[in-house]
């Protein structure tokens, strides 16, 4: 069980590294496939100097900002939306949950919050205060707390494109803070507005990237779900094994039936609806 769990973690890390490598190849080195399927820049694709970015970018690209490709919806002050008697609460997603997932210390919020601040597996989250982190969420449904943005598409740009663009730009913010020998306190909407990134005029190249990366994201979420199920199984079985209540035979086999990853049809019962935006400016 431990080996299988660590194996899944290793696979997820490798998948993330491979996806990032492909992103860098296409959108940093600009060797995305040209019309003939050859690497654009390496095959002599025309590059144009951009004065704002201070670098050459492919012809037909421009300098834009993160708001052009993504929407940033801030979470709620969840302490103002505690669950009422009889409600089935949602766990609150704070920066701690982004690191550790849900724990016994995780707070709860009413399920009657706007859909825009409900989080589902596969959503992109960006903690913008104190700890600057971007992640593909895979710890289960929850309610988003303030100091974290839920990042969604703007102007039709796909998830994989705005995820890696944001991931790269967070590194820019961190390097700026390091150069000033200070800690970046938080990222505001103004910081995002002032960001500068290279964006293709025709988003078909971003859509082609999405076709390749979307299955990778789906597999990463599935593996994380399995990791969580195995972790829960470990935490609940170890005390039983230690005090002799179960043994590594048929007792354990029967218990395993109760700890499995939900199948696809069960996961589909939870639909990810998008509601009216309730974003709050940072």
Give the location of each predicted region.
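Non-catalytic DNA-recognition/assembly elements of restriction-modification systems
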Residues: 2-25, 44-77, 203-250, 259-282
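Alpha-helical scaffold segments that mediate packing/assembly in large oligomeric complexes
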Residues: 21-41
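Secondary-structure transition motif
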Residues: 29, 35-36, 74-75, 157, ...
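Short coil/turn segments at secondary-structure boundaries
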Residues: 37, 79-87, 176-179
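Sequence-specific dsDNA recognition surfaces
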Residues: 47-55, 64-82, 89-121, 144, ...
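Flexible loop/turn segments at secondary-structure boundaries
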Residues: 100-102, 133-135, 248
């Amino acid at each position: 069980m431990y080996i299988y769990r660590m194996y899944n973690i290793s696979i997820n890390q490798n998948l993330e590294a491979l996806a990032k490598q492909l992103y860098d190849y296409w959108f940093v080195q600009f060797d995305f496939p040209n019309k003939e399927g050859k690497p654009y820049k390496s095959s002599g694709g025309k590059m144009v100097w951009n004065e704002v970015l201070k670098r050459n970018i492919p012809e037909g690209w421009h300098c834009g900002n993160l708001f052009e490709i993504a929407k940033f919806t801030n979470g709620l002050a969840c302490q103002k939306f505690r669950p009422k008697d009889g409600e089935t609460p949602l766990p609150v997603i704070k920066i701690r949950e982004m690191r550790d997932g849900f724990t016994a210390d995780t707070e709860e919020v009413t399920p009657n919050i706007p859909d825009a601040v409900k989080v589902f597996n596969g959503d992109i989250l960006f903690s913008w205060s104190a700890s600057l982190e971007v992640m593909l969420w895979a710890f289960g449904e929850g309610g988003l707390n303030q100091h974290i943005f839920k990042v969604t598409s703007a102007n039709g740009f796909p998830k994989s494109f705005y995820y890696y663009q944001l991931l790269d730009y967070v590194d820019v913010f961190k390097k700026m803070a390091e150069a000033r020998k200070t800690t970046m306190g938080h990222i505001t909407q103004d910081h995002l507005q002032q960001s500068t990134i290279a964006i293709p005029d025709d988003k078909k190249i971003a859509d082609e990237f999405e076709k390749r990366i979307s299955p990778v994201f789906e597999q990463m979420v599935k593996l994380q779900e399995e990791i969580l199920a195995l972790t829960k199984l470990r935490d609940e079985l170890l005390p039983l094994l230690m005090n002799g209540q179960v043994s590594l035979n048929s007792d354990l086999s029967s218990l395993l039936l109760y700890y499995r990853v939900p199948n696809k049809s069960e996961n589909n019962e939870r639909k990810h609806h998008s509601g009216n935006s309730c974003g709050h400016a940072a």
